[in-house]
């Protein structure tokens, strides 16, 4: 199972934090900091993208997860894409899933960068939700992921325009009716 997906930059500033296992808020911050410390100290040219972490990090209250927890990450430019998984997941499959995630983001944003993730967080979350739900992988076809997210974005843009039209109509009614409607547009 995938317990968490973390995207953070080289200054430990989170760009996406998604937990699929309940984790207390203070522990979420601690986990992010500890994962950052573990990853940022590694030399990616000679060390692998796989780390084993103590399972106590992902415990919630009296519940403790007894599986071996692994951190699987990939560095792209200034961002670390990090998946925290249990021992039931294949390390290479998760590494490939990170690549799929980044490829889908690249297609949605035309060469994704950190600012895209900051200002378009809804699309970022939509892409992730098309790939993973409830800690389980549901889609890995980049083309299908991008098509679904594009359709979702088109639908939300249409709803936003429709909402603006209603807002303009309401404003026109409250300001004296529709007689000056064309002049205000």
Curated annotation (Swiss-Prot):
Organism of provenance: Eremothecium gossypii (strain ATCC 10895 / CBS 109.51 / FGSC 9923 / NRRL Y-1056)
Cell compartments where the protein resides: Golgi apparatus; Cytoplasmic vesicle membrane
Keyword ATP-binding (UniProt): no
Quaternary data: Adaptor protein complex 3 (AP-3) is a heterotetramer composed of 2 large adaptins (APL5 and APL6), a medium adaptin (APM3) and a small adaptin (APS3).
Keyword Mitochondrion (UniProt): no
Family listed: Belongs to the adaptor complexes small subunit family.
Alphabetically ordered keywords of this record: Cytoplasmic vesicle, Golgi apparatus, Membrane, Protein transport, Transport
Protein's job: Part of the AP-3 complex, an adaptor-related complex which is not clathrin-associated. The complex is associated with the Golgi region as well as more peripheral structures. It facilitates the budding of vesicles from the Golgi membrane and may be directly involved in trafficking to the vacuole.
Protein name, entry field: AP-3 complex subunit sigma
Topology versus the membrane: Peripheral membrane protein
GO BP annotations listed: Golgi to vacuole transport; protein targeting to vacuole; vesicle-mediated transport
Name of the gene encoding the protein in the UniProt record: APS3
A GO CC annotation given for this chain: cytoplasmic vesicle membrane
